[in-house]
């Protein structure tokens, strides 16, 4: 089964994806790639330009509710305080090559990746992609805040992230 129709696939841009080393543990990020669909890095998940909090600590902007489909595929969801929130993968390596950084149920960026391994299907995938906005396939849906309120759409093209944390920067604790 395909996630996208042929016309939708043609309306997705290829993206040069930089696979930098983990900014806290210097674990090699591997080769850069050109991809149509990918997952965010630590730097991207902590980028205010993308709407996220700069700190790697708890953040509402990184919380993500699992869909029924994700749960049926094995993704674990919090059943208590953060109801239906789940962990999601980042592409940055963790403290060593066997771990991958991830975001936990309360939006904390877990840069070590400890506690989950590469084959752990309890962690969900939250894909990122770039759309050709000139395509007639896509329609702007507006914005919806975390409280469910819709706002008047403001189309603003995104630019390359201008924030790249280094191990020397103080941007919060690392777990």
What residues fall within each predicted segment?
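Collagenous Gly-X-Y triple-helix signature in extracellular proteins
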Residues: 1-175
């Amino acid at each position: 089964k395909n996630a996208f129709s042929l016309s939708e696939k043609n309306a997705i841009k290829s993206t040069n994806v930089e696979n930098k080393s983990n900014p806290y543990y210097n674990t090699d990020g591997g080769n850069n790639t050109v991809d149509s669909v990918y997952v965010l890095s630590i730097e991207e998940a902590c980028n205010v330009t993308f709407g996220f909090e700069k700190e790697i600590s708890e953040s509402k902007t990184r919380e993500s509710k699992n869909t029924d489909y994700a749960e049926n595929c094995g993704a674990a969801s919090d059943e208590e305080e953060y109801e239906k929130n789940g962990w999601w993968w980042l592409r940055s390596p963790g403290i060593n090559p066997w771990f991958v950084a991830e975001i936990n149920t309360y939006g904390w960026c877990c840069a070590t990746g400890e506690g989950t391994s590469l084959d752990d299907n309890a962690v969900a995938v939250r894909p990122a992609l770039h759309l050709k906005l000139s395509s007639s396939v896509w329609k702007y849906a507006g914005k919806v805040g975390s409280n469910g309120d819709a706002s008047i759409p403001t189309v603003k093209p995104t630019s390359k992230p201008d924030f790249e944390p280094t191990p020397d920067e103080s941007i919060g604790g690392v777990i």
